C-alpha cells in the first residue's frame, strides 16, 4: 500500500484557526478583566523558580522575603503551576476557614499519585466522598482522644525503656535527634500494628523518603504536563522504586496481621480497626486494600514529625536559653516530686511546659508550607483566584511576622502567658498544624507524645553540650524533609538527676 500524505480539508483548517482565535480572545479577556495578586517578575518557562533557588535559601524563607516586598497575598509561577502565597493571619483565615470548601483540595503531586496509592490517603487525598469518609474514620476511630488514651501504656513502657537507655549512656555525647526519632517510630509501630516491626529500619527509611518526596517542589510537580521530564529527571523511576519497596513492606505487614488475627478478638491496634471496618463497617464507600495501606503508612508517620522534630527544636532552644531550661525543669520536678517517674495523667499540670511547646511550634511549625488547591473561581482580598491555582500558606512566615509578634526571632515562652492564642486551628497567628477541614489529624497524638517526651527529658536529666559547642555557637540551621527539621543532629550529654 502506498503511503500518502493526508492533507486536512479547508473546513477543518478554517475551524482550527477559529478555535485558536477564540482561545486567544478568551485568554486576553480574562487577563484584562481579572485582578491577580502582585508578584515578582516571571521568567519564560520556569517562572519564579530562579528567585526561589537564589543563594540556596529554603523555599519558605525566600517566600517570606518576597512577601515583604509584594504583600501577604502574592502570585508566583512555579514552572507551569500558578501559585498564590499566603503570609498573614488575615489571609490565612480567608483560605483555611472563611472559604475552606473552595480551598479544600490538595495539589496533585506525583508522589501522592505513585506512592500513596493514587491519593487514597488522608493527607494528600482528593476532596470528595472517599476522602471525607477516610477523614471521618481517622478522626472518630483512629486518632480520637479515647483511642489515643488507650495506648497510654505503650507510650509509658517505651519511654521508660528510652530513659534507661539514656541513663546507660550518661556522661557521653548522645545523638538525641536519632534517639527520639527511633522512640516515636517504635511507639507508632506498636500503636498501628500491635508490635515492633521486624524490618523497622526499612520502614523508618521509607517514611522519611515518602515525606521528602511529597514536599512539592520537584521537577515533576512544577512541570506536571511534561511527562518526559518526569523520566529524564529520574523522579518517576525513583518513585516507582519507592512505591514497590513500600507496597512490599505494607503487604507483608497486613498479610501477617490477617493471618495472626483471632476470630472475635477486640481491636487493640489501628490496623485491627481498619480491617474490621473493611469487613463489617457498612461504609458508604468501600474501604479498599489501597486505602488501608495508605492509611497504615500515614499512621506510621502520624505524630512522628511533630513529636521527634519538635522535641529536637524545643531541647535546642532551651539549651540556648538556660533560664528557660531551668524554669521548665523546676516545674516538672516540682509537679512529680519524688515519684521517680512522669505520669502522663498529670502532664496537664505543666503550665510552663505548655508555653514552651507553643513557642517552639511558633518558631518551628510542623510543616513549612500548607498546600491547598482552589476548586472554583473566587476572590481573596479583592484578587481573583482561579480553579487549579495552588495555594501555599506559610505558617513559618506568620509565626515570625513582626506585625504580629514582638521580637519574633526570640525564643520567649512567656509571651503566651495569659494569652488565649493556641495552635488548634482557631487562632491564625499560630497555625503549625493548619486549620479547617484539612487540619493535621495527628495533632493531638503528636502533642501527647511531645509533652511526654519533653517532661521525661527534663525530669530525669540535666543536660550539657559536648566539648566545643556552646549556647552561642549551637547551629540552628533548618533543613526540609517532610517537616522543618534541624540540618545538624542535636548531640547532648545527659547527667542523671535524682529526686533525693
UniProtKB/Swiss-Prot annotation:
Keywords: Heme, Iron, Membrane, Metal-binding, Monooxygenase, Oxidoreductase, Signal-anchor, Transmembrane, Transmembrane helix
Subcellular location: Membrane
Keyword Oxidoreductase: yes
Enzyme class: oxidoreductase
GO MF annotations in UniProt: heme binding; iron ion binding; monooxygenase activity; oxidoreductase activity, acting on paired donors, with incorporation or reduction of molecular oxygen
Cofactor: heme
Bilayer topology annotation: Single-pass type II membrane protein
Pathway: Secondary metabolite biosynthesis; terpenoid biosynthesis
Gene3D superfamilies (UniProt xref): Cytochrome P450
Keyword Transmembrane helix applies: yes
Reactions it catalyzes: (-)-casbene + reduced [NADPH--hemoprotein reductase] + O2 = 4-hydroxycasbene + oxidized [NADPH--hemoprotein reductase] + H2O + H(+); 8-hydroxycasbene + reduced [NADPH--hemoprotein reductase] + O2 = 4,8-dihydroxycasbene + oxidized [NADPH--hemoprotein reductase] + H2O + H(+); 4,8-dihydroxycasbene + reduced [NADPH--hemoprotein reductase] + O2 = 4,5,8-trihydroxycasbene + oxidized [NADPH--hemoprotein reductase] + H2O + H(+)
InterPro entries tied to this protein: CYP450_71D, Cyt_P450, Cyt_P450_CS, Cyt_P450_E_grp-I, Cyt_P450_sf
Biological-process GO terms, alphabetical: terpenoid biosynthetic process
Name of a matching Pfam family: p450
E.C. designation(s): 1.14.14.-
Family indicated by similarity: Belongs to the cytochrome P450 family.
Protein name: Cytochrome P450 726A27
Gene: CYP726A27
